[in-house]
Amino acid sequence: MIELPEAINLAKQMRETVRGKTVSAVYPPSSPHKFCWFNHEPEEYQALLAGHTVTGAAGFGIFSELEFDGGVRLCFNDGVNPRFIRKEEVRPKKYQLLLEFTDGSAIAFTVAMYGSISCHSGDYDNEYYRKSIESISPLTEEFDEGYFKELLASVKPAMSVKAFLATEQRMPGLGNGCLQDILFQAGIHPKRKVSSLSDCEKNVLWAQVKTVLQTMTEQ
């Protein structure tokens, strides 16, 4: 599943490979997947995206997002895997969405387990998307000790540290993949109750959230 470091790196890879390319065609699923969700009928993505040029890409929370001219965006999450395909490469037989560009290259999106691929113009009213894009990222200066302690104070004292970090999208993009490293580096058992943490342990935990996510993003 996509976590924050991967979301950011996927966006970086897409900027490097498809920025400046114009969509010539959009193909709906060649192999329908009952756990791949769209916010429009897949056949409508052709009209929504064809003719638009990729201007950038962003990663936030549990989402990566392609940005096009005209304010059009294509976001995906969870088990959705984008694959860049060069002009000379054979297109995969199975995909959930395929964008073809005017230079003959393409991006194929496939889904492992489950995920969503949504096209919108900044008005995507999805709870997980809104939390991902609007929450303060652990990789920013705004995510300081004070903000982290506010999050800690907002949960029930009996909640485990593991549940605090990885549930309810309190820190979108922080999931099980990052969690174990954070707790190991902080020296805190995942079943410890939030109420049992000393101020020193809270500071160490905050620092490791930022450090581990930054390190994973840069790898």
Describe each region flagged by the PLM.
Residues 22-44, 58, 151-219:
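Basic, nucleic-acid-binding surfaces and adjacent catalytic neighborhoods in DNA/RNA-processing proteins
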Residues 74-185:
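Phosphate/anion-contacting hairpin/loop surfaces
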Residues 1-119, 127:
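Gly/Gly-Pro- and Ser/Thr-rich, intrinsically disordered tail segments characteristic of DNA damage-repair
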